[in-house]
């Protein structure tokens, strides 16, 4: 295997089964969809603003205004990356008035829609056979997924636009500057993009969209970032662009003196004339849509001109620590930096003896994602997004086998490091002595000229004093050129503590892998200049329908708060409220019922809780094993092995340490009793724990995902926000308001008022620290860590709110006084006598 382009594909249900009306019956109407909420909210907003008397959300019957807030967070990486490009996009798209015909007469309702009134757009006579519509104002694309041309159109749109929402029948995309950069990087020409959009659109493509596409693609590829002898150089073939960069107030001062001098413009122009003389232009025939489709689907249209075969004639050097600043500034001035690696012609770095084993098979979607990265003998830096359980690791391994240079892999935890090493040895011919591991427990280096190193973000990003062995390995990593770097769970890279690893390690090609390209801090757009554009994003529903991942039934179970708990909930502080709705007795009973129900079906069940106190209480009450951050490694392995291979252990409780670091393909049911507020990423990562089910290809099989939510609490708002990412991927959450038969199960927990009052008293006695969320032990969670990636140690004294009962020993604490003199006397006695003395003292 020499290139991904040479691959040949090996091969080219019902989501909600009938489980009985008694089980999934609902006493209330289904909740309104996001579209209905937005529509009702917009209809009433103007009226409410005129009166200024009450909240607009209250005018929508049965809806709360916090649901409206989910609209801003429901969109994925596309909207996050667009936030930084708003000014540029608006400048290119603002001139939409030129698209309105002169003879257009607004009707009586045009004023209600204002800028969203597109009644002036004229449908084409054959619009029924065309699958998409493009908004002239913001570049949003609506695709009919039931159209005969939908499959080809999806492959095209994923290349040129960002997927926003992809439910069953209607998909939404958005054209952004970054998505167009990615399209040009895989070989598409500007005219080809406009031509195909025009042929697929129900209405003529607006002039504003055409100008936006031309403006975003005209400057791509004119500035390159290359690595020579472990030094970074900015290169360009045009003298005016070089002069502009050097005169820039940000980039100019970052230039450092080197022996690479800029050639005179006359020489540059003469070389350009010699290079381009006699070369025919190669454009895809606009009349041949199939040719353009094949060019997009294939990933590269094999351009005849080899304009990159010779070295750039203009260059200047920048320092390693300035790489991020320069790349970001180039994005801002509309000259995005191109990072391509001509690995076939790189004879300076030694080759790595690595190939896929003959038994290794690449799935079609994995091959398609790799074709976006490789083309024309070059490797492009960028990001590939695949759902959990879809084989992201194998994609990275295949890319490493294609480049055949030294590889470094960065993961989020030491557990992931060992998994990556094991996967490399399983799927390819790499020898164990060429595969090194760099963690807190293992500090290895390969002894040959080239090899593989697997490490964590925390180990590389650490800025504290290192041990001798650790510093020796770090010098080894930073003192050489790497052909390829794989960034697992790449969504953690924008964090302040980890983004420095991108420039610390000098790598020619970068590949970011993730299932959830979302962050709650809107820093996901930084990946466009830290790593590169998004090269490919798979459709979760499509992979599920083809059997590559499991079909999942998602449900939100509403658990009413008992009267005693809700009364205390209304009067307590925010942190104590969290503990009350997590320890809701009705939620406990629902969890117990679902565990018993699915154990009878033969399912393997995982129960997730971010709150350690609740995790222990639930698990001990039900007699189930549990794992959290303080669980010893050996005990973890024993519990996981029994869960996988012991028929008597069918349920385990996990804290957030199981979100990403634990691979349990046997799990078929997941129950979530507490979570990390409104984190969309965590919701998708937890769903991924059951997407790897081994029986996913069995007819009629489904995996089950339950989110238990205490009704009429803040948890309902967080739950709606968390589901936004999965809803955009096409998943539907069924609302269950009552579990029939729950009251009749034997040994129902907290069935009597007395038991519920005792539980409430125990919860109220707990201090607010018990309501906290466990800090993860991996790089995927930056909470509780310092700027260098190390865990923050608790201080001896913590300032916080308290009560007089706590000072008086009323929080389940006892006061004990010891006599120092008596203790000294007891030291001279036999240990048995000392034990009897202390025993009597406690009585």
Swiss-Prot record:
EC number: 5.6.2.4
A matching Pfam family: ResIII
Cofactor(s) the protein needs: Mg(2+)
Domain (Helicase ATP-binding): residue spans on this chain: 373-535
Highest taxon of the lineage: Eukaryota
Span(s) of short sequence motif DEAH box: 488-491
Gene3D superfamilies: P-loop containing nucleotide triphosphate hydrolases (3.40.50.300)
Modified residues annotated as Phosphoserine in this record: 752
Reaction(s) catalysed by this chain's protein: Couples ATP hydrolysis with the unwinding of duplex DNA by translocating in the 3'-5' direction; ATP + H2O = ADP + phosphate + H(+)
Basic and acidic residues compositional bias, start-end: 42-56
InterPro entries: ATP-dep_DNA_Helicase, ERCC3_RAD25_C, Helicase/UvrB_N, Helicase_ATP-bd, Helicase_C-like, P-loop_NTPase, XPB/Ssl2, XPB/Ssl2_N
Annotated Basic residues bias: 64-74
Example of a GO biological process term: transcription initiation at RNA polymerase II promoter
Additional observations: Present with 825 molecules/cell in log phase SD medium.
Its job: ATP-dependent DNA translocase. Component of the general transcription and DNA repair factor IIH (TFIIH) core complex. When complexed to CDK-activating kinase (CAK), involved in RNA transcription by RNA polymerase II. May have 3'-5' helicase activity alone, the TFIIH core however has no 3'-5' helicase activity. Also involved in transcription-coupled nucleotide excision repair (NER) of damaged DNA. In NER, TFIIH acts by opening DNA around the lesion to allow the excision of the damaged oligonucleotide and its replacement by a new DNA fragment.
UniProt xrefs under PANTHER family: GENERAL TRANSCRIPTION AND DNA REPAIR FACTOR IIH HELICASE SUBUNIT XPB, RAD25/XP-B DNA REPAIR HELICASE
Assigned protein family: Belongs to the helicase family. RAD25/XPB subfamily.
Record's protein name: General transcription and DNA repair factor IIH helicase/translocase subunit XPB/SSL2
Organism in which the protein naturally occurs: Saccharomyces cerevisiae (strain ATCC 204508 / S288c)
Gene: SSL2
